[in-house]
Amino acid sequence: SGSCSLKTCWLQLAEFRKVGDHLKECYDGAVAMRLGRRRTLELRNSRLNPPSADDLVYLQTSPDYCTRNARTGSLGTVGRACNKTSAGMDGCELMCCGRGYDQFKATVVERCHCKF
């Protein structure tokens, strides 16, 4: 028969969450560098392996996100609610930055407009 088949390929972005997770993983493994005498990047710690073309590198350390800093606009984490059972970013271990945290129980009464 004289039928044709058509195949179309296109690039598509990954899910936003996957992109964010990948960037966070790269950020956590970023390699500290310094500007050398010849204005080239050098490892700050010569005992580490040089970064690959896919690695993130940095010249300045990140600000301390735990404490308030008006210059950078960081509000810090003091007074924020954390999740005691989470190992993620909302977990008390990370969010409280080693300062410890207060625990409390709260009972919330809400109208749920339930129908039986």
From Swiss-Prot:
Assigned keywords, A-Z: Developmental protein, Disulfide bond, Extracellular matrix, Glycoprotein, Lipoprotein, Secreted, Wnt signaling pathway
Similarity annotation: Belongs to the Wnt family.
Lipid linkage positions (O-palmitoleoyl serine): S1
Changes after translation: Palmitoleoylation is required for efficient binding to frizzled receptors. Depalmitoleoylation leads to Wnt signaling pathway inhibition.
Lineage: Eukaryota, Metazoa, Chordata, Craniata, Vertebrata
Purpose of the protein: Ligand for members of the frizzled family of seven transmembrane receptors. Probable developmental protein. May be a signaling molecule which affects the development of discrete regions of tissues. Is likely to signal over only few cell diameters.
Residues annotated as signal peptide: none
Major localization listed first in the record, in broad terms: secreted
Disulfide bonds: C82-C97
Name used for this protein in its record: Protein Wnt-5(II)
Keyword Lyase: no
Localisation: Secreted, Extracellular space, Extracellular matrix
Alphabetized PANTHER family for the sequence: PROTEIN WNT-5 (PTHR12027:SF77), WNT RELATED (PTHR12027)
Ribosomal protein keyword on record: no
GO MF term list: cytokine activity; frizzled binding
Species this chain originates from: Eptatretus stoutii
